[in-house]
């Protein structure tokens, strides 16, 4: 077993070194803006001023939603102040960071987005309002987080909407003489999937032609709703294709240009309650969630748990992830080491960059984000 584990470690190291070796071969794409992004949710305890822009190039304001009658973005009076503060903060920070606002999110009305994408007048009203909001509040771009188109028709409608969106952005830039707005989308960890609906695939050609990049949500892969523990954002999974690398490769094999892909990483872990505290590896039987809302624990909370409970911390070679356990509580998560592995693979695959979900969950000194930024700088 020791030899097998050592071999796996060596394979991981070899692939990271491959990323470093690609420096010369990627020089032709050096003009492309690399992405070190993070999503920010409205949080009085974590205002925009607390974000360290030396670690990030792009900050995503989350979330705005369209009105279900006018189909235009609905901006509340409180959001007006929040949006103004957000963009002004990141334009005046040193270094400054680009800002985008994100539309939708996990709790949004997927059916409304589906209707907007399918109805040309509604789609035009929606798109024009997004450009107006971006220019009014000084954003550099727009991000769509539609979770998720439910069938092939909705995917096709998404592709057409992206085409119309890009055209409107290009026309606005040509008319005003301003640099065109960025247009991005947050997408499922794999290019094709069947959860939350019928089997379907993202509109690859439209993504390549109309989006600056997609933020691939390479997390929420395992959770306490399952009856066994697992890596919430495992880099690998030898028993299935539910892993970060598998998902990214599905996008690349589908024809999406690697430099259109930005890998997502979570700043949180997921907790389980073990059925038997003496059985505590990956795949151990469980009986629901542990601490946190639905088992979600911020990275800083995981560290507090480890310290207060004198938890045992293990690195799992098969998934390149970390887990802690104490008593019946089991937590799967990423730490600076596993994030370095992921960044190495992102570079080996020649991705555009990475992003984190979500600001406020790292430690106060940004342990995870700092290590990711350092790892990326290696090339």
Swiss-Prot record:
Changing residue 289 to P: Confers Nod factor hydrolase activity. This is Class V chitinase CHIT5b. Its EC number is 3.2.1.14. Keywords: Carbohydrate metabolism, Chitin degradation, Glycoprotein, Glycosidase, Hydrolase, Plant defense, Polysaccharide degradation, Signal. GO terms for cellular component: extracellular region. It holds the Pfam family Glyco_hydro_18. InterPro entries: Chitinase_II/V-like_cat (IPR011583), Chitinase_insertion_sf (IPR029070), Glyco_hydro18_cat (IPR001223), Glyco_hydro_18_chit_AS (IPR001579), Glycoside_hydrolase_SF (IPR017853), Glycosyl_Hydrlase_18 (IPR050314). Pathway: Glycan degradation; chitin degradation. SMART domains: Glyco_18. Possesses chitinase activity in vitro toward glycol chitin, carboxymethyl-chitin, colloidal chitin, and the chitin oligosaccharides (N-acetylglucosamine) (GlcNAc)6 and (GlcNAc)5. Hydrolyzes (GlcNAc)6 into (GlcNAc)4 and (GlcNAc)2, or two (GlcNAc)3 molecules. Has the capacity to reduce hyphal growth of the fungus Trichoderma viride in an agar-plate bioassay. Residues 34-379 form the GH18 domain. PROSITE patterns: GH18_1, GH18_2. GO terms for molecular function: chitin binding; chitinase activity; endochitinase activity. Changing residue 289 to A/K/P: No effect on chitinase activity. One of its GO terms (biological process) is polysaccharide catabolic process. The keyword Hydrolase applies. The active site is at 147 (proton donor). Glycans are attached at residues 68, 109, 128, 192, 227, 241. Belongs to the glycosyl hydrolase 18 family. Chitinase class V subfamily. Residues 1-26 form the signal peptide. It comes from Medicago truncatula.
């Amino acid at each position: 077993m020791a030899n097998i584990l050592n071999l796996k470690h060596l394979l991981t190291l070899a692939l990271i070194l491959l990323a470093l070796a690609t420096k010369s071969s990627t020089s032709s794409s050096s003009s492309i803006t690399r992405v070190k992004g993070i999503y920010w949710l409205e949080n009085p305890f974590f205002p925009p001023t607390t974000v360290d822009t030396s670690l990030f190039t792009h900050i995503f304001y989350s979330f705005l939603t369209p009105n279900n009658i006018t189909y235009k973005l609905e901006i509340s009076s409180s959001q007006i102040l929040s949006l103004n503060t957000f963009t002004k903060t990141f334009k005046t920070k040193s270094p400054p960071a680009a800002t985008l606002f994100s539309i939708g999110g996990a709790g949004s009305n997927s059916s409304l987005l589906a209707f907007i994408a399918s109805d040309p007048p509604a789609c035009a009203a929606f798109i024009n309002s997004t450009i107006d909001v971006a220019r009014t509040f000084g954003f550099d771009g727009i991000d769509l987080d539609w979770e998720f188109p439910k069938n092939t028709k909705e995917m096709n409608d998404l592709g057409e909407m992206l085409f119309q969106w890009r055209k409107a952005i290009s026309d606005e830039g040509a008319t005003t003489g301003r640099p065109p707005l960025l247009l991005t989308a947050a997408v499922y960890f794999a290019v094709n999937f069947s959860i939350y609906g019928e089997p379907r695939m993202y509109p690859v050609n439209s993504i390549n032609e109309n989006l600056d990049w997609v933020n691939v949500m390479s997390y929420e892969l395992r959770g306490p709703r399952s009856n066994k523990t697992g890596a919430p954002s495992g880099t690998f999974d030898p028993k299935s294709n539910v892993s970060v690398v598998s998902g990214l490769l599905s996008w690349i094999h589908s024809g999406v240009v690697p430099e259109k892909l930005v890998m997502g990483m979570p700043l949180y872990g997921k907790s389980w309650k073990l059925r038997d505290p003496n059985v505590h590896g990956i795949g151990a039987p469980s009986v629901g969630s542990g601490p946190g809302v639905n088992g979600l624990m911020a990275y800083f909370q995981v560290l507090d748990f480890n310290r207060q409970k004198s938890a045992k911390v293990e690195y799992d070679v098969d998934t390149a992830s970390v887990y802690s356990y104490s008593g019946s509580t089991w937590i799967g998560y990423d730490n600076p080491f596993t994030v370095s592995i992921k960044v190495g693979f992102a570079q080996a695959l020649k991705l555009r960059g990475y992003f984190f979900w979500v600001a406020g969950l790292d430690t106060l000194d940004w342990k995870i984000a700092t290590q990711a930024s350092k790892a990326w700088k290696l090339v």
